[in-house]
């Protein structure tokens, strides 16, 4: 894990970070203690694990930020229903906000969402990126343009180690999308386990799905007050990716 922006002396606390000169510099994860944060939120394993690490480091998550399709009904990245993400946020005990955008307008809308977070006093954002430099450059740029700074608790961790940690911590991650040329649609709705990771490794599939091989939705884990109950809906193929429609399970009667 890198310590971007760290120096040999202890960095100043959050009260001193709000100056225009340094508030947009990336924040070393070790400096999260006592810092109110927003979390970039897909609903999947990486954002959930980043949230867990932020909590363990003493951060105070105040808001989840999720991007939806232009109609505002499903998440832009994973195709998850808005209602499902709201149920997940309730189980985490963290409010959630949504921005709706086309892919072309994605960056502008996200920046506006982060500007609003900054207005609420949240000048640090937690992101779940692992080791792709162009992704890090992009999130740091967008966060900075909104007057906030990015913190990446998972940065440069081994992908295998992160996936083992997901399992060891008890996160329950359901496969909600698979790339048609990488994995079979029969995996949709399955929960990631050790046997699945071994199969991925044998097939040459990235264990963390960093190349878009698969996406997940986390239904339970350390930060959750209770499991998010779901049912499986129809499967659809869109632009070379299989998706399953995950439905929030409502109590009968």
Regions inferred by a protein language model and the residue ranges of each:
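Nucleotide-activated chemistry modules centered on ATP-dependent adenylation/adenylyltransferase
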Residues: 2-5, 10-253
